[in-house]
């Protein structure tokens, strides 16, 4: 019997064979500190109109949702988790959410936002994908389709094309954080990119000469360079230069997470900046030495929590119009494995935060953790479709029609209704 809980309260890592393969998301562009592929001029908006921002964060490698948001009151939880279980009492106790679910102790910023009703959790969630390949799982998560296969566009890019124009939103295209455009943002809509600077910045004179050359010899490359220079000017205007633009660790390093979050927040907060963005953090494939309240996963979750704080600080001027969603390709096994970690699973969690979020809630149609309740006898069984969450956000936060969501953005999802009550 499922327990319905909707509370209202105050790329692959080492050890996974896919890590050695070349990513399908190869570099699509290069530059100095910025990567850009297209450019869209800003659209004037009516004074006083709502100006929403949406940021999608992808945790690559498969987040262990049973550790991030442990169901501490499920009678089967502690025995299944063994050494990686999160305790409800003690020095490193889980942070309370609603009496049934709790939060990993490394996520203090998220816990505060939850208490302030600016953050929520959706548990036992997954895409339609039921296999356990990182690449296929991430492709399905980002493409928005109901099955894996060759695709050339992502659902967030298609959402940009369907976004209403005029007074409700001022859009300047999408923003990708990192050295390549993620699949979720690929497509016909305009996209620009930013990444921490890894080589010395080119001088203005060199940039001008290259632009003149490309505009005469290769107009398409000239457009891309012009877009990159435009984004560079925006980054400089927002103070993302010098030491702030130097890499502070990889995408799986807490410092790298925080730096990427700071860059995304500053660019999204700019009055003439983009309104929709995506970034990803690697390293969540915790097959071995995962740890419980402390250890490898705790370090990653602490970095993610630091990124949440950076979002809140950097987006402060527009925080009330901001929604952030954090997702992963699939979950991990319910049982601890023989190397004190967890293996590829199915159901997991998604996080929502921001001033536009109707927070203080855990959305969960809880399936239970007894063996007969697990998916294939090993995984948390998903009872919610990630597409329902995406649809609810895009409909209620960005004003995209249900018809466009079902037909263009998430084809084949007519049976998946957008989730209600996610935003204010």
Features from the language model and the residues they span:
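Feature for exported/extracytoplasmic and membrane-associated proteins, marking the mature portion
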Residues: 2-314, 335, 349-353, 358-424
């Amino acid at each position: 019997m499922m327990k319905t809980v909707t509370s209202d309260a105050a790329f692959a890592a080492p050890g996974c064979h896919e890590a050695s393969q070349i990513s399908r998301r190869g570099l699509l562009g290069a530059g100095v500190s910025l990567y850009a592929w297209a450019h869209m001029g800003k659209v004037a908006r009516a004074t006083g109109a709502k100006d929403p921002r949406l940021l999608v964060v992808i945790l690559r490698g498969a987040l262990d949702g049973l550790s991030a948001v442990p169901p501490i009151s499920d009678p089967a939880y502690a025995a299944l988790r063994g050494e990686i279980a999160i305790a409800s009492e003690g020095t490193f106790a889980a942070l309370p959410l609603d009496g049934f679910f709790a939060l990993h102790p490394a996520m203090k910023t998220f816990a505060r936002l939850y208490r302030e009703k600016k953050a929520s959790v959706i548990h036992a969630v997954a895409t339609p994908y039921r296999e356990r390949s990182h690449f296929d799982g991430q492709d399905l998560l980002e493409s928005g389709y109901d099955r894996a296969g060759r695709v050339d566009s992502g659902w967030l890019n298609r959402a940009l094309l369907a976004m209403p124009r005029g007074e409700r939103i001022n859009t300047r295209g999408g923003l990708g954080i990192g050295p390549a455009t993620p699949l979720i943002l690929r497509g016909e809509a305009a996209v620009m990119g930013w990444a921490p600077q890894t080589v010395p910045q080119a001088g203005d004179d060199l940039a001008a000469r290259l632009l003149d050359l490309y505009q005469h010899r290769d107009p398409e490359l000239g457009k891309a360079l012009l877009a990159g220079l435009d984004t560079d000017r925006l980054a400089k205007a927002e103070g993302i230069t010098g030491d702030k633009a130097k890499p502070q660790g990889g995408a799986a390093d807490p410092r790298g997470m925080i730096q990427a979050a700071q860059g995304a927040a500053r660019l999204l907060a700019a009055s003439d900046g983009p309104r929709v963005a995506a970034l990803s953090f690697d390293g969540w494939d915790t097959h071995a030495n995962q740890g419980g309240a402390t250890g490898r996963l705790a370090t990653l979750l602490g970095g993610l929590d630091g990124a949440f704080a950076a979002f809140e600080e950097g987006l402060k001027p527009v925080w009330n119009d901001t929604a952030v969603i954090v997702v992963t390709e699939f979950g991990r096994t319910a049982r601890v494995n023989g190397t004190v970690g967890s293996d590829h699973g199915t159901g997991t969690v998604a996080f929502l935060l921001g001033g536009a979020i109707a927070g203080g809630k855990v959305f969960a149609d809880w399936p239970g953790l007894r063996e007969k309740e697990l998916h294939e006898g090993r995984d948390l069984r998903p009872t919610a479709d990630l597409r329902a969450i995406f649809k609810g956000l895009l409909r209620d936060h960005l004003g995209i029609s249900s018809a466009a969501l079902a037909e263009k953005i998430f084809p084949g999802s007519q049976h998946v209704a957008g989730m209600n009550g996610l935003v204010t």
